[in-house]
Design a protein with these regions (language model features):
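Catalytic Walker B motif of ABC-type/P-loop ATPase nucleotide-binding domains
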Residues: 175-178, 450-453
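Conserved ABC ATPase signature
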Residues: 150-154, 158, 425-429
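H-loop/switch region of ABC-family ATPase nucleotide-binding domains
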Residues: 209-210, 485-486
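A short, surface-exposed alpha-helical micro-motif characterized by mixed small hydrophobic
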Residues: 215-217, 491-493
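Conserved beta-strand-loop-alpha-helix hinge in the C-terminal portion
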Residues: 229-256, 505-528
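Conserved ABC ATPase "signature" region
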Residues: 128-146, 403-421
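ABC ATPase nucleotide-binding domains
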Residues: 246-298, 521-547
Length: 547
């Protein structure tokens, strides 16, 4: 029997030399990195297109590659003096903690407290130490109010904070976070980054993130990864000199960086940028809105869990309208969509009414409702049932007897940037790519009312634009959309109507500019101000509703 290899906790957190990896032995490399290094206590931000290799790279640091995803055997990756390919995953997890994009794949236990305690318990720590770590992690992530809650009733954003607490309770030397705020509202995003700011200098942090405006204020380095290669690795202060490269790689450059370059100002000096915008009288153009069509769907939902009201709201959708629903995590946004589709857990009590084009579907089954509404939930992986991307997208087309299903499949593959992945297993793609597969599959059903839960989550700027153009093209063809999102910029640019939910109730509705500028949203917030929020710091007038 081979003697167990002791885990080293000293040395450089990450050192890469001559890394090449492909998911299939002998296949085309998806990652080629000549040299890369992360120093102790650094905060490294890894950015790039969806599917560009960011998650693959960090999975080489935490041992997921090659111990879970086999493929070719990557050499040249050393973490704290441990050769990753030769170090068992349980030993690596003692020094490297990982927060995944999708918290539902990471949260395993029935209650929040049990989940946070699970890791320390597996380290066989004394009971008092476990309690201490649980208390600290729950306090650090500000989830005290969730401590005794069942994990299955939590929103995606709440689950993400629970998953972060569970990782922090392990007290890893290095923390890897793969899109840690993808499902979190702006208020929760700010809380996460406040938590991470408190860890700076105490732990080494590696963050994969699309929300640059939130992360840039506290990172040390920015690493751009595209097509499996490190294109640049620079200090944060030099980022303003690489804006063209960021655009070319599908990165949504923070608004204040664009203004800073235009005015010749320091991008970190938000006050100076705002003052210049006000002095020059610059304003955002208001996009055209489509809100005068006939009502195609009336939906009411009242949902309770253990006597607590989760949702009590009615929303009407008009023909050729893109209606967005925003609000803080736990506001009832996703629960509303699930109620419309009759997808609720048995533990929840619900009353609902659904009328589509004059047809009362209040007592209709999921299957019957599916003939009128296409739905892509947050947990979209449950939709992916086929062996290849091509089969997944063509399934609905073939099922409804479309004679031109091959041509339509090709069209959707092209529209959603999936042509190069047509033969791939959907579940082996990145989160952003899988989400696009699910959306393409839903839209191929031909149903004219579509509900999308967080469609831009995990997407880079390039693919957000693709999704937006596809939605507007379909809107012109008579489609109507309800979109749950935390992406305020997406809402302002592309939606026609906005509903704000808070504690399950509608507190505000109107066009995006009406809502964002309304004093009812706890102060007047001009669109320019809204675009230029101080990175990482929620404005008090926006914090309550989580817009």
């Amino acid at each position: 029997m081979t003697e167990a290899v002791p885990i080293s906790t000293g040395g450089t957190p990450v050192e890469v030399k001559g890394l090449t990896y492909s998911y299939i032995e002998g296949g085309k490399p998806v990652l080629t990195v000549d040299s890369f290094r992360i120093e102790d206590g650094e905060v490294a931000l890894i950015i790039g297109k969806s599917g560009g290799g960011k998650s693959t790279l960090v999975n080489c640091f935490n041992g997921v590659i090659p111990h879970i995803f086999m493929g070719s055997n990557p050499t040249g990756v050393v973490v704290y003096g441990n050769v990753v390919k030769d170090t068992p995953l349980p030993k690596l997890s003692a020094v490297v903690g990982t927060l995944l994009q999708d918290p539902e794949t990471q949260v395993l236990n029935y209650t929040v407290e049990e989940e946070v305690a699970f890791g320390p318990e597996n380290l066989c720590l004394p009971t008092e130490e476990i309690r201490k770590r649980v208390d600290e992690a729950i306090a650090t992530t500000d989830i005290t109010s969730l401590r005794d809650r069942e994990t299955y009733v939590l929103s995606g954003g709440e689950l993400q904070r629970v998953a972060l607490a569970a990782v922090l309770a392990m007290k890893p030397k290095m923390l890897i976070m793969d899109e840690p705020t993808s499902n979190i509202d702006p208020e929760g995003t700010a809380r996460v980054f406040e938590t991470l700011t408190g860890l700076k200098g105490k732990s080494t942090l590696v963050i994969v993130e699309h929300k640059l405006e939130r992360a840039l204020h506290f990172v040390d380095r920015v690493v751009l990864v595209d097509q499996g290669k490190v294109l640049f690795d620079i200090e944060k202060g030099k980022l303003v000199d690489h804006l063209e490269e960021l655009h070319a790689s599908g990165i949504d450059v923070p608004e204040h960086y664009l203004w800073a370059k235009r005015f010749g100002l320091d991008p970190q000096n938000i006050d100076a940028i705002r003052a210049r915008i006000v002095a020059d009288g610059l304003k955002l153009e208001v996009p055209p809105r489509q809100n005068d069509g006939k009502v195609v769907m009336d939906a009411f939902a009242h949902v309770e869990a253990q006597g607590k009201t989760l949702v009590d709201a009615e929303i009407s959708l008009k023909e050729q309208q893109i209606l967005a629903i925003m609000g803080r995590n736990g506001a009832g946004k996703s629960t509303f969509l699930k109620t419309v589709m009759n997808f609720l857990d048995k533990e929840l009590t619900a009353r609902s009414k659904l009328v589509i084009n004059g047809v009362d579907l209040s007592k209709a089954s999921i299957q019957q409702r599916g003939k009128y509404i296409a739905y892509v939930p947050q947990s979209f992986d449950l939709m992916l049932i086929s062996k290849t991307v091509e089969e997944e997208i063509s399934y609905s087309l073939r099922k409804r007897g479309a004679k031109d299903y091959k041509e339509k499949t090709e069209e959707f593959l092209n529209l959603f940037g999936l042509k190069d992945f047509r033969r791939r297993d959907p579940l082996m793609l990145s989160v952003g790519q899988r989400r696009r597969v699910a959306m393409a599959s839903a839209l191929s059903s031909g149903v004219k009312i579509v509900m999308l839960d967080e469609p831009t989550s995990g997407q880079d700027f390039y693919h957000k634009e693709i999704i937006s153009k596809e939605l507007h093209m379909l809107k012109r063809l008579g489609y109507s959309f309800i979109i749950v999102t935390h992406d305020a910029k997406f809402v302002y640019r592309y939606s026609d109507y906005l509903v704000i939910l808070d504690s399950g109730k509608k507190i505000l509705e109107g066009t995006p500019e009406q809502v964002f500028e309304s004093s009812q949203l706890y102060s007047v917030v001009p669109p320019t101000e809204f675009y230029l929020r101080n990175p990482g710091i929620p404005l008090p007038e926006l914090s309550r509703a989580g817009v």
